[in-house]
Amino acid sequence: MSAVTQEATAVPRTLQEVVFVDGVRTPFGKAGEKGIYAQTRADDLVIKCMRELLRRHPELPKERVEEVAIAATTQIGDQGLTLGRLAGLLAGLPKTTPGYSVDRMCAGAMTAVTNVASSIGFGAVDVAIAGGVEHMGRHPMGEGIDPNPRIIGERIVDESALVMGKTAENLHDRFPHLTKERCDAYAVNSQRKLAAAYAAGK
């Protein structure tokens, strides 16, 4: 018998460049029965945005869109099921275009964007649509949920952690010096640093 040796083949780890092409959103509106979206379904808000995005880019064949990721915190009623898939179909994408939902507090849409960006980066897809919806007028935060009582009873988290509005109030009370003006100035400075880094080729 002879010994057989195999040389390990190094697979190059290269990432594709990811480009954010365009963004669409609905106008702000007030919640409640008198709000401009009171009679509008949450999924229809997403569909309107997707249709507008596709209208703006006639150079992009719809079949080139290989993934749709849509986030919603309160996944109930017209924000339930698989928003990415259903909204994609109703927006006119082919039946072959897959989609999914992201359920995450406060950063769901951002997570949807980073998820598809990662997929593009390592070559799983070339073109994707990502975003989020939260129809507070139709689905107030916490509607239909039933958190396990042990979360509070065993003091795993403070009760205020279940309501983002309360968290915002706590932050204001603990850090009153973090005014909107200071936060805006910080954001502007961050963008300037980014522009300088790009200009320097970093």
Where are the model-predicted features located?
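Short histidine/acidic/glycine/proline-rich micro-motifs that form metal-
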Residues: 73-75
